Amino acid sequence: MNSTEISEDVEEVLKNNPVKAEGSDATLDCSRNSRASEKHLLESVLTALHDSSKRKQLDSDGQPDSVPSVKRRRLIPEALLAGMRTRENSSPCQGNGEPASRGRSGSCAWPAEEEPSTEATVPSYKKPLYGISHKIMEKKNPPSGDLLSPYELFEKANSSSGPSPLRLLSESQKRECGVGVATDGDLNIYFLIQKMFYMLNGLTTNMSQLHSKMDLLSLEVSRVKKQVSPSELVAKFQPPPEYQLTASELKQIAEQSLSCGDLACRLLLQLFPELFSDVDFSRGCSACGFAAKRKLESLHLQLIRNYVEVYYPNVKDTAVWQAECLPQLNDFFSRFWAQREMEDSQPGGQVTNFFEADQVDAGHFLDNKDQEEALSLDRSSTIASDHVVDTQDLTEFLDEASSPGEFAVFLLHRLFPELFDHRKLGEQYSCYGDGGKQELDPQRLQIIRNYTEIYFPDMQEEEAWLQQCAQRINDELEGLGLEGGSEGEAPRDDCYDSSSLPDDISVVKVEDNFEGERPGRRSKKIWLVPIDFDKLEIPQPDFEMPGSDCLLSKEQLRSIYESSLSIGNFASRLLVHLFPELFTHENLRKQYNCSGSLGKKQLDPARIRLIRHYVQLLYPRAKNDRVWTLEFVGKLDERCRRRDTEQRRSYQQQRKVHVPGPECRDLASYAINPERFREEFEGPPLPPERSSKDFCKIPLDELVVPSPDFPVPSPYLLSDKEVREIVQQSLSVGNFAARLLVRLFPELFTTENLRLQYNHSGACNKKQLDPTRLRLIRHYVEAVYPVEKMEEVWHYECIPSIDERCRRPNRKKCDILKKAKKVEK
């Protein structure tokens, strides 16, 4: 096809469309002033048309034909008609013409002139040449296949008669811009890209609308807040009928409670037992976990708070509610499900009771081998219950553990008894397989960590766990190798390494008072190894001593050893004997410790070394520096901190209890490592009255607490009824003082554990407890426990209990857990 054929096609188009020509002539008459600019536009279009016709000519010799000027002039009206039509239809209100043709202008190039029937109309994504104003229309009006411009209708009407000049005009425009013939795949990509941009524009518009609505809502909320008075901020909350308690029911629960936090926990169990059950609850979900499904909602808390406010009006203060009730509720609820998660993760699929592991019947023994074999075969099914520590064990561990590391070691003895039955086996293990050793069972180790994190929240951080607990467990396992003896030695349950002691030393077992206890359960009482000092040779120290007066004779060592409760207590008594100048009424020892740290003075290193010399003579493990540091240095520092005078020693001698002799029965199955248990620093045990609820010298019905003779803020004063309730729950006068501490210092017993920063006297770089409230505690102690030597009782029983209560973490209340156990059943 040459330029002459194109001009003839244009003539035919103009002849077949007289109405268009008339409209264009009318339009031209109204736009004479713009004729010059449009003529310039027309010339550029004809130039592009001429170049296109040259490229389309496949059989020509490459010489372009000249376009006659007459046919050029005959094309002017149609070209100008298209330009004017662009201006007329540029309004966004018109949707039947330009917007559609703007988004889908023209059609694709023809594959060949001989195949006109295969042409297909496809949208063009090039910008038209007839105005910048169409950029706005392109954004506002998406392309639509239903809306066809007159230009497209014209092309469809002439598709059977061959290519139209306007199609060639569009083709020439695309070629002028440097775009070649596009394939179907490219056009599909272009269409998807355009559709994506339209979707993005739509999303942007929706987001803008949402932001506008949010702004309107914020303004509305601000307006409403200005109209509501502060007294009306808390709306009236009417509980559903099934959650309403009668006055008698609420009174009964309140009488069993110790504080507002205790009452809140009891109400949680009473009102919402479904929160503690597994009904319709998918356990073992690896995606969400247990805590994601179980949580206290605001309506739960609001209902509980309403009931608590009836008996504790101060809870209406939000600060009191958040400080005294909310932390206890969250702590109790989270610990419940944390332990439930540990139980449900046990192997074998057996889920044991959450609150209390099944106790072994003391009267149940194996009568024959058949039963024993049956039990061994069924042992795999009961392994889950062996990995659950009951509440009583946890209470004992917490009472005696002075740090998270010690608590973890106690659990290690409980959950890994096989390592302590065979001592040489224990030294082959470490927490995570460090140092080429075998790794402990990850499941049981995770149980230890979970329990530790519950009672010591600071251990939830990985670094704290590794430094304080994992390292302490590794030290315990490493220490087993020191006491394991020779390779061929049979496993023992004795307290010390008998192979390293003289031949005349025998081992006294613990009295059998715990029939039927689980392996790993430890006793509170451990007796020292009896030693025949007549046959014992005491070597002279291999280091210089400042004077011979510090050396002890065999009789002195015998006397100190026989009056000691444990090897740690023996070291403490040596400290008292070798540093007499510190143990006077001035209590100068409070200014000293073994290392001189914490701003204190260092004890005489020579005499400390002499103490170690005597200790390792009777306890060879003390030769290891790590064992000495972990087991004895802390006890010596504790002995320096503790209040003690000659009066204390005489007071303890008066209350000393007879220790059973060698007639104690052997407990051959006692499979634990007793020497690692925490020794009693506080001197000989107190008489049975300390462990009974009858310590109160006055009948409770006749108990009347006089008013204090010193000024006390009214919130801290307790009624006679409250004092009687605390007395009923106390086990001793020291425990009574500790419970009063919790009652009168509520701000210290929260999840923040601020009490760890305090003690009675403010020693050891700690803060001192409020003297007024401490004086009030003593006032109540004197009213309940009137004795002649109240000063001794206060200093030797109450103050240590108060300081110990500040050191140890919160524990679960057993009575609450028992009730929760009933609810779960």
Curated annotation (Swiss-Prot):
PTM (free text): Sumoylated at Lys-20 by SUMO1 and at Lys-509 by SUMO1, SUMO2 and SUMO3. Sumoylation probably occurs sequentially, with that of Lys-20 preceding that of Lys-509. It does not alter association with heterochromatin, but is required for the repression of transcription.
Residue ranges annotated for the BEN domain, each copy included: 239-340, 384-484, 547-647, 712-813
Gene Ontology molecular-function annotations: rDNA binding
Cross-link Glycyl lysine isopeptide (Lys-Gly) (interchain with G-Cter in SUMO2) per UniProt, renumbered positions: 20, 39, 54, 56, 71, 126-127, 135, 140, 156, 174, 424, 509, 525, 697
Localization of this protein: Nucleus; Nucleus, Nucleolus
Summary of subunit composition and partner proteins: Homooligomer, probably a homooctamer. Interacts with HDAC2 and HDAC3, but not HDAC1. Interacts with SALL4. Interacts with SMARCA5/SNF2H, BAZ2A/TIP5 and USP21. Interacts with the nucleosome remodeling and histone deacetylase (NuRD) repressor complex. Interacts (via BEN domains 1 and 3) with ERCC6L (via N-terminal TPR repeat); the interaction is direct.
Entry's free-text remark on domains: The BEN domain 4 is necessary and sufficient for the localization of BEND3 to heterochromatic regions.
Task of the protein: Transcriptional repressor which associates with the NoRC (nucleolar remodeling complex) complex and plays a key role in repressing rDNA transcription. The sumoylated form modulates the stability of the NoRC complex component BAZ2A/TIP5 by controlling its USP21-mediated deubiquitination. Binds to unmethylated major satellite DNA and is involved in the recruitment of the Polycomb repressive complex 2 (PRC2) to major satellites. Stimulates the ERCC6L translocase and ATPase activities.
Name by which UniProt lists this protein: BEN domain-containing protein 3
Organism from which the protein derives: Mus musculus
Gene transcribed to yield this protein: Bend3
